[in-house]
């Protein structure tokens, strides 16, 4: 389980990116993190694995306070934190299998890493994961020949090869079409349930978050303003998170000037 207590982040400019964030994410739960740009969502993910150092507060992962670890201890702890990135972070010239196996580079010695020599058990697990994410036919295909959805599946398999306890997912569907986005979110959900993973997903697509997350946390100006189930994310709650907007509108409405311009154009033809 992940527990975050009173986490704050102040940048050297004085700007507060996070203000006393307190959360618990139990094993097996998929939590979606929503909010406007600049709300602190990406900063929160990066503070959890200490890619960004928090200013104050604590981050507990299965009984270990990550904020108190030294460099060596943090390196060990990060093995239990899988990251899935919006931009996939694949090595384009390497094959699917080589990219997946790169998730194990921190587990083997220098020479094994240098020559990319992995234990047979690790290779077998990589093949099993490729089959699980739907890429069993593409182990030797180069990453630069894959579609966006396939690349994201490689990223998921690579993260799972670490055998993580926590999965941090940053905008996994930002570059994907609606059908592929649903497939990726469904896959993440299934894997979290199968493996008992705590999952935090930073996502801008609110309807997609409501469809697949068991819990939604809304951030605004670095503070938690909503924490609850998807079905309670009403228009008034969305206004609190994002600011005033007509959340019931079905599409863009033309203002009176646009309508007048259209009418004038029709009249002249």
Swiss-Prot record:
> Mind telling me which GO cellular component terms the entry cites?
plasma membrane
What is the official name of this protein in its record? Answer: Phosphonates import ATP-binding protein PhnC 2
User: Which Gene3D superfamilies does this entry report, sorted A to Z?
Assistant: P-loop containing nucleotide triphosphate hydrolases
Q: Which family does it belong to?
A: Belongs to the ABC transporter superfamily. Phosphonates importer (TC 3.A.1.9.1) family.
Q: In terms of one coarse class, where is the protein primarily found?
A: membrane
Where is this protein localized, as stated in its record? Answer: Cell inner membrane
What's its membrane topology? Answer: Peripheral membrane protein
Where do the record's region annotations for Disordered lie? 246-269
Query: What reaction(s) does this enzyme catalyze?
Result: phosphonate(out) + ATP + H2O = phosphonate(in) + ADP + phosphate + H(+)
Q: How does it assemble?
A: The complex is composed of two ATP-binding proteins (PhnC), two transmembrane proteins (PhnE) and a solute-binding protein (PhnD).
Q: What does this protein do?
A: Part of the ABC transporter complex PhnCDE involved in phosphonates import. Responsible for energy coupling to the transport system.
Q: Which residues are involved in binding ATP? A: 35-42
ABC transporter domain location: 2-246
Q: Name one GO molecular function term.
A: ATP hydrolysis activity
- The yes or no answer to whether the keyword rRNA-binding is present is no
- Any idea which UniProt keywords this protein has? ATP-binding, Cell inner membrane, Cell membrane, Membrane, Nucleotide-binding, Phosphonate transport, Translocase, Transport
Superkingdom of source: Bacteria
Q: Write down the NCBIfam families for this protein, in alphabetical order.
A: ABC_phnC (TIGR02315)
Q: Known EC number(s)?
A: 7.3.2.2
């Amino acid at each position: 389980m992940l527990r975050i207590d009173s986490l704050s982040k102040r940048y050297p400019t004085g700007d507060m990116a996070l203000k006393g964030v307190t959360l618990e994410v139990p094993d097996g739960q998929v939590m979606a993190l929503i909010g406007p740009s600049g709300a602190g969502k990406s900063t929160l993910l990066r503070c959890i694995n200490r890619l960004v150092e928090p200013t104050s507060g604590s981050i507990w992962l299965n009984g270990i306070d990550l904020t108190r670890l030294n460099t060596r201890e943090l390196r060990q702890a990060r093995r239990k934190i899988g990251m899935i990135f919006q931009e996939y972070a694949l090595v384009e010239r390497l094959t699917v299998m080589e990219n997946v196996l790169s998730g194990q580079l921190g587990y083997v010695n220098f020479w094994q890493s240098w020559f990319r020599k992995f234990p047979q058990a690790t290779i077998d697990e990589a093949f099993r994961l490729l089959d699980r994410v739907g890429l069993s036919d593409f182990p030797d295909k180069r990453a630069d020949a894959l579609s966006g959805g396939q690349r994201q599946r490689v990223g998921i398999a690579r993260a799972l090869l670490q055998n993580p306890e926590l999965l941090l997912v940053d905008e996994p569907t930002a570059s994907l079409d609606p059908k592929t986005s649903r497939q990726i979110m469904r896959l993440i959900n299934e894997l979290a349930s199968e493996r008992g993973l705590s999952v935090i997903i930073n996502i801008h697509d609110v309807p997609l978050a409501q469809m697949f997350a068991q819990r939604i946390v809304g951030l605004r100006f670095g503070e938690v303003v909503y924490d609850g189930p998807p079905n309670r994310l009403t228009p008034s709650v969305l206004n609190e998170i994002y600011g005033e907007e007509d959340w019931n509108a079905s599409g863009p409405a033309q203002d009176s000037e646009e309508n007048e311009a259209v009418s004038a154009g029709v009249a002249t033809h």
